[in-house]
From Swiss-Prot:
Organism of this sequence: Dictyostelium discoideum (Social amoeba)
Region annotated Disordered, chain positions: 1-20, 83-104
Stated name of the protein: Uncharacterized protein DDB_G0274469
Lineage, top ranks: Eukaryota, Amoebozoa, Evosea, Eumycetozoa, Dictyostelia
Bias (Basic residues): 94-104
Biased segments, Low complexity type: 83-93
Length: 104
């Protein structure tokens, strides 16, 4: 008899602990099919700058990285082909091109 009563108490405690974090985040008010979450005063005082910063990061990081990698790979292949053909003639210009590609 005592085992069943302790199990019931454990389930009620779990339900109360899951609802506590929501009260810390903000006050939730229900009004005609809309759930409005009012943020606490600390979050409201901060200026809305984070949304602009996220947009800048997404545009700069997604597109150029793949394009730059492709360009670098193409340049390396071209430089290797030129050095193989020019090694017999011994041109100094090709050597300078090699160094530029290596830095990138």
């Amino acid at each position: 008899m005592t085992e069943t009563s302790t199990a019931k108490v454990a389930t009620t405690k779990k339900s109360t602990t899951t609802r506590k974090p929501f009260s810390l985040q903000g006050v939730i008010t229900h009004s005609s099919s809309r759930t409005i979450i009012k943020a606490p005063e600390r979050l409201a005082d901060q200026p809305p700058v984070a949304s602009k910063v996220v947009r800048k990061k997404s545009t700069t990081t997604v597109k150029p990285t793949t394009a730059i990698k492709k360009k670098v790979e193409k340049k390396k292949v071209v430089a290797l082909k030129k050095t193989a053909s020019a090694s017999s003639s011994g041109k100094k210009v090709v050597a300078s091109k090699k160094k530029v590609v290596a830095k990138k």
